[in-house]
Amino acid sequence: MKKVSILSLHLGYGGIEKSIVALANLLCESYKVEIACVYKLYDKSVFELDKRVKVKYLTKIKPNKKEFHEYLKKKKVFKTLKEGIKGIKGLYIRKNSTINYIENTNSDIIISTRDIFDEWLGQFGKEGVLKIGWEHNHYHDDMGYANEIVRATSKLDYLVLVSESLKEFYSKKLVNTNCKCIYIPNILDNMPKKMSTLTEKRLVSVGRLSKEKGYMDLLALYNIISKEYPTWSLDIIGDGSEREKLENYIKEHNLGDKVTLHGFQNKEYIDKILNKSSIYLMTSYTESFGIVLIEAMSHGLPCIAFDDAEGARELIDSGRTGYLIKNRNNRAYIQKIEDLMDDLETRKRIGKESREEVKKYDGKEVIKKWLQIMKEK
């Protein structure tokens, strides 16, 4: 049986990490699968990993970006300098350990999941190894970032993109290289057996509590809505750097009995909340694909998102499987929420279409596309 290696920064919480685990679990039916992981953040992967998948940790170090910025903010010069030196040393170890793995692994296929891994794989990957880059992020009109991806992947065999628009964009950029661009969507690893009844007065959102996800915007929108619809609650599942700000906002606006911050939770917990909710809300400023969006749609939830989240534009057919709000128009966003709150039949109609739409992201379908390009090896 041939061997596939997937290069991963860590196996903690994150959309990329969730996708890595989903792919590894499916590939182990046809290949020996090893995840080469730079950082060991937890004792095991936070997402359930098939026992047949081997995990190899390349270093014993942990990232210290958070500590560095905290000391910098507090103007603690000595500790900032100490963490800075530690960080530089960590980057050196990360580079050498990853390159050493790429040069010495006996894998037939190596899949890179970060741009820096793409570069090292292109430079140091052995001849005869199938080299695949897997780009999850959107360039968001940042041509500097886009050009960096092009430079890093130009020596690879394939660049897998998670959206059609990204595939079209990078195909033009890489036209004079040997790297072929392929569109393969992220994987919906489980289709729930039952849809939500959509009868509970619960709004829900899942994601990292970081600025680009727009959760402060979501709370501001909900604060307005809750005055007219006081019996509707809001569940936010996830954690991150903005949590304290969200907690303060909830306290200041007396929303504690209506808004629940659940923190990081496992898939079973998230599925349970989604299946008891009636409307899914996304307020992200940027989103390459939106795994949580297809998970919500798989439960038959009508979804609302701002259209500047690129991934949402590819997943939501506005009016049929949810609503896309242009120009971050808060009033329009609120109106669509209220429309759905007022009309159970519309919720059911859109929810049914949503669930049908995401069947094409089922793992059994998506893995066929991966296996097709791997046949070269």
Each predicted region: which residue ranges?
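A short, well-ordered alpha-helix in the C-terminal region of glycosyltransferases
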Residues: 231, 332, 339, 346-360, ...
